[in-house]
């Protein structure tokens, strides 16, 4: 027993003077980037306005804790092109813009940058990686967001957030990141992103969207109609063209309905029950066209009468 104790003490002394391997701090995949509705709308609008060129801007927000990055607002940078280089970032414009935003009640700091990839997915090119490394030199947790305004449709925004991987950790065969939480959702990487160095030179960060009551009211009021829209008078020539289109559609549907009535005479009860399955019902479409034409003409007539009466 004393022999084992001596061996244990010797091992402890060797451990004290030797270099024990220690666990390094790996990147945590539970870190999430929360983008506000205002910032997302601004990025999409800026990216759509710059098509087919790439555009760039800076993101304002705060680092809440080790696992949360809030992006509250964004502003555009005055350049566009096929690539965004480090030299293209104008520090004078950035400083002036931040000063003006502070005067309007935006004291947030720069948490990263965004740029658009119109039509070719979300990934970082070599120039983008150099730009992101320049941002990470100022802040280790800076985030690069890539948005595709061409592939983005209503209900599905093509967007992703990235951060570069330290090449020293890759040289030591360390993991680029370590999954420590089941929170968040990583998008399935595309083949283009894997070809351009995803999980080798940079890694993806989950993105979430958090809206409060004021943002929900703002989004609901975007396409909200007012009472003026109901009484507005359209161009009479345009209204006449629409009536012609309605009449042509009704004539075509009437012919189809007449043909359908002739075909029903030779059908059995089972065939009549399934005759409109997977097909257009001309009778119902005629009723829809008539209802739409009547509503448009009634509203146009009433709006014209109100305008004439009020101006007399």
Swiss-Prot record:
Q: Name one GO molecular function term.
A: metal-dependent deubiquitinase activity
Query: Quick one: a GO biological-process term for this protein?
Result: programmed cell death involved in cell development
Residue ranges occupied by any MPN domain in the UniProt entry: 33-168
**InterPro entries named in the record:** JAMM/MPN+_dom, JAMM_MPN+_peptidase_M67A, MPN, RPN11_C
Q: Which keywords accompany this UniProt record? A: Hydrolase, Metal-binding, Metalloprotease, Protease, Proteasome, Ubl conjugation pathway, Zinc
Which CDD domains has this protein been placed in? MPN_RPN11_CSN5 (cd08069)
Query: Main EC class of this protein?
Result: hydrolase
Tell me the SMART domains matching this sequence: JAB_MPN (SM00232)
Q: Give the GO cellular component terms, alphabetically.
A: nucleus; proteasome regulatory particle; proteasome regulatory particle, lid subcomplex
Renumbered to this chain, motif JAMM motif spans: 115-128
Question: Pfam families attached here?
Answer: JAB, RPN11_C
Q: Which domain of life is it from?
A: Eukaryota
Q: How does it assemble?
A: Component of the 19S regulatory cap of the 26S proteasome.
Member of which family?
A: Belongs to the peptidase M67A family. PSMD14 subfamily.
The identity of this protein, by name, is 26S proteasome non-ATPase regulatory subunit 14
- From the UniProt record, report the name of the gene that encodes this protein: rpn-11
């Amino acid at each position: 027993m004393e022999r084992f104790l001596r061996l244990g003490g010797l091992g402890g002394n060797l451990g004290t003077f030797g270099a024990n391997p220690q666990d390094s701090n790996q990147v945590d995949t539970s870190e999430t980037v929360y983008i506000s509705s205002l910032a997302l709308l601004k990025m999409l609008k800026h990216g759509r306005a710059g098509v087919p060129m790439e555009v760039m801007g800076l993101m304002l927000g705060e680092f809440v804790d080790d696992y949360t990055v809030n992006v509250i607002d964004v502003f555009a940078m005055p350049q566009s092109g096929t690539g965004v280089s480090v030299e293209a970032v104008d520090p004078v414009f950035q400083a002036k813009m931040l000063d003006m935003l502070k005067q309007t009640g935006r004291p947030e700091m720069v948490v990263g940058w965004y740029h658009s990839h119109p039509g070719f997915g979300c990934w970082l090119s070599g120039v983008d990686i150099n730009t992101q490394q320049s941002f990470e030199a100022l802040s280790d947790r800076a985030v690069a967001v890539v948005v595709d305004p061409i592939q983005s449709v209503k209900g599905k925004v093509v967007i992703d957030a990235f951060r570069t991987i330290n090449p020293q950790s890759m040289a030591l065969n360390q993991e680029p990141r370590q999954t420590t939480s089941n929170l968040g959702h990583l998008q399935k990487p595309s083949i283009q992103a894997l070809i351009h160095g995803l999980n080798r030179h940079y890694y993806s960060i989950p993105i979430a969207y958090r809206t409060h009551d004021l943002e929900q009211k703002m989004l609901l009021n975007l396409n909200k109609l007012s009472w003026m829209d109901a009484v507005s008078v359209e161009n009479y020539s345009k209204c006449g063209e629409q009536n012609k289109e309605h009449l042509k559609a009704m004539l075509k549907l009437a012919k189809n309905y007449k043909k359908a009535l002739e075909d029903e005479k030779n059908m059995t009860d089972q065939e009549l029950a399934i005759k409109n399955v997977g097909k257009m019902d001309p009778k119902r479409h005629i009723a829809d066209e008539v209802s739409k034409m009547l509503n448009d003409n009634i509203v146009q007539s009433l709006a014209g009468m109100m305008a004439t009466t009020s101006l007399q």
